[in-house]
Amino acid sequence: MSDKIKPSEAKRTEILDNVQQMTVDTKFEELGVGTETDKTRAFLKIQEGCNQYCTYCIIPFARGPLRSRSLESIRDEVGKLVAAGYKEVVLIGIHLGCYGKELAKEGKHVTLYDAVKAALSVEGVQRVRLGSLESVEVEPRLLQLMAEEPRLQRHLHLPLQSGCDKILRAMHRPYDTKRFTELVNEIRAQVPDVAITTDVIVGFPGETEEDFATTLPPPPPPAPAPLHTFSYSKRGVTPAAELREQYDDAVNSERAARLAKGDEGLHPRMLQGTVGKVDEALL
């Protein structure tokens, strides 16, 4: 392309902005879920979009603002899944803990608790499980429901991302390690046998060896439970992509391997806690 017809950087930005405005939805697209009768677990997306803008994440730019599936649609879709033979439904979303937040503008005051209640209200559903959500967005009444309702699985996936407060601030995470630990302790106090898993990102720009050492091993609670370890991956248009101290893949992979090795003892400890217990399996 010649310089004469190549768009200027300002023009390219204008074009991208216009395309984004045309393609970003403001309402949840209530698509149905495909069914396969030989499966026992189905995933139902009830929330789309994110407004957290973590500095490493491209999702808010790519997926747009918060949108939530209606309670009526949740009940309908869970009913269809049960009729198709599914025994467990996992409620998932991009920013699941913000379910219903944008609906307040329409006078509809609903939260993730209401979405879970809607799913549980469907006759024949044997289990309901939650996808990943932020620790700061776990409602006390949701925990009470989890403690009292046997069909709501006692499992929470709460991303930590780093055991270093400096890195958490740079990531624009909504907590520090002290607050995260307090929240996990509060959850365990209300639901003592809850299984808690987490995500950790290693190699974030500017993460020194000393910063990494605060996460290794293991990071602050939750434990004992396996960690999901990820190496930082640079994403264009995100603030983290502009940071000067970017590490190469070799450094990130080495740190991920060390964290995974430190995590090796957590899974056996979790399994040891189940010895002598009887639980239900879905087939």
Tell where the protein language model's regions lie, with residue ranges.
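Proteins enriched for Cys/Gly/acidic motifs involved in redox and nucleic-acid/cofactor modification
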Residues: 1-100, 111, 141, 146, ...
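Residues in well-ordered beta-strands of folded domains
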Residues: 22, 131, 282
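Short aromatic/hydrophobic contact patches that present stacked aromatics
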Residues: 43-45, 168, 201, 280
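Conserved SAM/AdoMet-binding glycine-rich loop
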Residues: 83-209
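Hydrophobic, well-ordered secondary-structure elements that form the walls
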Residues: 158, 199, 219, 227, ...
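Structural detector for short beta-strands of small beta-barrel domains
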Residues: 273-283
